[in-house]
Amino acid sequence: MEGTPSGAAPSSALAAVLKHSSALPPESAQVQGYDFNRGVDYHALLEAYGTTGFQATNFGRAVQQVNAMIEKKLEPLAVDEDHHEDLTQSRRPLTGCTIFLGYTSNLISSGIRETIRYLVQHNMVDVLVTTAGGVEEDLIKCLAPTYLGEFSLRGKELRENGINRIGNLLVPNDNYCKFEDWLMPILDQMVQEQNTEGVKWTPSKMISRLGKEINNPESVYYWAHKNHIPVLSPALTDGSLGDMIFFHSYKNPGLVLDIVEDLRLINMQAIFAKRTGMIILGGGVVKHHIANANLMRNGADYAVYINTAQEFDGSDSGARPDEAVSWGKIRMDAQPVKVYADASLVFPLLVAETFAQKADAFRAEKNED
């Protein structure tokens, strides 16, 4: 190049490639992964995620968020603090942080059911939100098992054999027949109580009743019933439960489920909470229902999303936490985290680093009906 001394690199290229850096903030963490020369220490391995980068670092931040929720939840309240127990419509005592857990139905179909059951059994969360499948699949598993299969199994052949596929899980259709046999007498009883005792059924009351009737400690909703943890499912008819309610309406019509009372219930849990935390696995109605309840208090104090959805189609499922901040569903001074990952991989690890580390601090499970 003209003007460049022989044997010297072009000055413009040198300036571009060897541009000097400004100093990073002093609190910037250095990237450092786990050193397996230390042996296999799973707690230390998961701690190292925080400085590993990418979604591992988001996982580490999610651990911090959930531990912050737990720390506030376990703080003793002042004696003169107003509990608003008459307004929340809940039999659960107020704590320093009300934790909302939302999850889609496929997670109950999977082995994440057992992780969720652990949290509910030990009173670690305060409000559950799920879909119809998130209720019925738990109950059905008490009647018959779900099996591992393959994502690649052909739908035509499965249908011919009465096998339903949920990703790489298989549910024999006979399971739903057993569910119908179990559920129909309960629906009959609910209609009778509605007509003779004036019982006003809601989705949450129905789910609590089903948890009582299943009477199986393997069930999420058995423990939700015992520990007075409300389970909200605004789309309760969108699944096998809805199919059974539909069929039952011909045999014994008249069952009414009031979703407005449940709307007041979840909103009041947020409004009168001292602080709130959201842990949301997946997207759709469960994600928005929890976030919208927290709008009623000008946003949640803590939030963790775990899902694989992207924001580029404008979906609520894919929306990052910052979009919820714009709506007032997460507080402006919060530090929410989204982990872009399959919850079946991440959620048990998150519980292992948070709730399970503090199991002794939570009150003993209740055992009365």
From Swiss-Prot:
Entry's EC annotation: 2.5.1.46
Catalytic activity: [eIF5A protein]-L-lysine + spermidine = [eIF5A protein]-deoxyhypusine + propane-1,3-diamine
The keyword NAD is assigned to this record: yes
Top-tier EC class: transferase
Binding residues for spermidine: 136-137, 243, 288, 314-316, 323-329
Keyword field contains Phosphoprotein: no
Gene Ontology CC annotations of this record: cytoplasm; cytosol
The organism's place on the tree of life at top rank: Eukaryota
A biological-process GO annotation: positive regulation of T cell proliferation
Active site residues per record: 329
Keywords from the UniProt entry: Hypusine biosynthesis, NAD, Transferase
InterPro entries assigned to the protein according to its UniProt record, in alphabetical order: Deoxyhypusine_synthase (IPR002773), Deoxyhypusine_synthase_sf (IPR036982), DHS-like_NAD/FAD-binding_dom (IPR029035)
Pathway per the UniProt entry: Protein modification; eIF5A hypusination
PANTHER family: DEOXYHYPUSINE SYNTHASE
Family of this protein: Belongs to the deoxyhypusine synthase family.
Role: Catalyzes the NAD-dependent oxidative cleavage of spermidine and the subsequent transfer of the butylamine moiety of spermidine to the epsilon-amino group of a critical lysine residue of the eIF-5A precursor protein to form the intermediate deoxyhypusine residue. This is the first step of the post-translational modification of that lysine into an unusual amino acid residue named hypusine. Hypusination is unique to mature eIF-5A factor and is essential for its function.
Name this protein carries in UniProt: Deoxyhypusine synthase
Species name: Rattus norvegicus
Gene this protein is translated from: Dhps
